[in-house]
Amino acid sequence: MVRKVDKTKLLTVIGIIIFLFGGAVRIFSHLTSSADNYMENFDVIIFSGLIIGWGVSVSYRIVQKNIRICLVISAALMLLWMTLRAIKYNSPADINTYGRYLWYSYYIAMVFLPLMMFFAMLNIGKPENTNNRKYLLIIPAAVLVLLVMTNDFHQLAFVFEPDFHNWNKQYSYGPVYYVIVVWIFILVLSSIVLSINQCRISATRKKLWIPIVIILVAIIYTVWNNLNHGYSGLRIYNVPEVFCFASIALWESLIQIGLVPSNTGYGN
């Protein structure tokens, strides 16, 4: 069992190194003025590989089926997000409507990832088909995504200049955007509260600071990045990368401290 736990920790360290390497690639391309699509594509491949590796890993490690499904869906959503981002940045700059809808599509992952986390937390230690009413939350999630995808018709999520002039730089946020922010905040906060309440082992409870720190670091970096436009005009990590890596790191921390049942080290 010790060897299995060590192997899991080793894979976690490798994942962190891959994430840092992705940031280093972007810094290198910025310093050498080679910020072209080739470097950006290489970055996407790095992060996509990390997501795929994690998704395959949890499909084998997670014992409880309903939690495993939530995590695999989460990995699929992250991969979708990275794929959409790659398509958007490999498209011509003047694609306008096409590029805008690719951007809107990011919110599929942003809305559903916190929901998958909430579902998984509710499922910890519960038999299958318990409290299926929680899945009704898929309805408001789908409505939020639909409102974003149809934003061109009502501009309740993003407000643009007339005729969508310079849409990717000149826009403001509408009420739907703020509803999504609140949606994400409530689901993440609820997931944390559930994790604390469901943590009955004192040793595990003492380690709950780890996932909380991960969430705080992700929030602080995102706010700082948006307010200061990165470091010297460079955003080392974009929102999709931070969001996805924070989700993976959060889940791994919950698995490692023993809150989420897995077949590596759980019950030690």
Where are these regions (language model features)?
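Interfacial "cap-and-anchor" motif at the non-cytosolic start of specific transmembrane alpha-helices
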Residues: 2-12, 36, 43, 197-267
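The cytoplasmic-loop to transmembrane-helix boundary for the fourth helix
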Residues: 3-17, 124-152, 207-213
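First transmembrane helix
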Residues: 9-63, 72, 180-198
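Alpha-helical transmembrane segments of multi-pass membrane proteins
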Residues: 16-33, 78-88, 149-151, 222
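Extracellular-loop-to-transmembrane junctions of the mid-late helices
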Residues: 32-48, 146-194, 226, 231-237
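Individual alpha-helical transmembrane segments in multi-pass integral membrane proteins
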Residues: 35-52, 63-150
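Transmembrane alpha-helical segments
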Residues: 50-52, 113-118, 188, 192, ...
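Alpha-helical transmembrane segments of multi-pass integral membrane proteins
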Residues: 60-83, 104, 135-139, 171-229
